[in-house]
């Protein structure tokens, strides 16, 4: 598939604010089912031997791919002294897990993947031996995966999550983060090590898309706060990770991320959808009028039946364009509403509480 078409699909989904789903419906043919007794830890001598061989080959693959992607790794020193941990990264290439493996070196690493990557063939067997952990549906399957993650981090391993969800090829901007990685870190009392890929253009390819040099930025570990609950730590580490992603983007590209205007796309064909997105881009951005009068709500008449309002869908961080306040303990810039000694959750985002930490 041409990369130009992938970029068009990314622009279409960005305009629809559909940040966490695949660009195309994944194939579910020839998959190995993820059952409640799925062997994530690969018990047995034969499985252990196969895992050792494939993990070594996986590390070698990262070394081979690094010059192809012209990979540069920044912040590798932040991994020193870190035991078992959750690693987060933006998902921008089918091979980015090998590049992350290149960064962590000989440290053993598990990789969480969607169930549609659990192929029932030789390729799937190699991936499983290399450390992939497919996510299954249902409470029993999720508990089994949770137990495997706990065993992995307790054994000193890294577990790689892609909290942005689906793969978007070379997508530069930070996307909304899902909770799973941060809940796992909070529940198991281990740090999150945030990573973020940025790109530098060079040359052009045949379909008009410029080639990319990859840089993998490794942030400082974000440790759970023992004074907070699992839920509060989930929110806290999630927002600090987004803070790192945003600050890394701004430092790499020299400006804040600008997202396409939101449009409601109702077209049936890909060409019509792309045209709708392009037309929305040509429209000037609307600036809200702060002095405009707010509409007054009509009071219901006596005995009038009112239709209940629909429940709003879960909201993601609002990605504010400004209001960057420091989080000096972690060395990152955090998007907040006002300066505080520690950090503040984004107003209108996934949480609305403030935590003050001593510096």
Label each region the model flagged.
Residues 61-91:
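Helix-to-loop junction immediately C-terminal to a conserved catalytic motif
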Residues 60-61, 129-136, 164-167:
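Short, basic, glycine/proline-bearing loop/turn elements
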Residues 2-32, 146-359:
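Non-catalytic C-terminal accessory region of glycerolipid acyltransferases
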Residues 81-139:
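Catalytic core of membrane glycerolipid acyltransferases/transacylases, capturing the structured
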Residues 47, 51-69, 124, 128:
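Short hydrophobic helices that act as membrane-entry/anchoring signals
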Residues 34-45:
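A short, surface-exposed helix-loop junction/capping segment
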Residues 138-142, 174-175:
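A conditional alpha-helix N-cap/helix-loop micro-motif detector
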Residues 64-66, 104, 127, 152, ...:
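A generic structural signal for well-ordered alpha-helical segments
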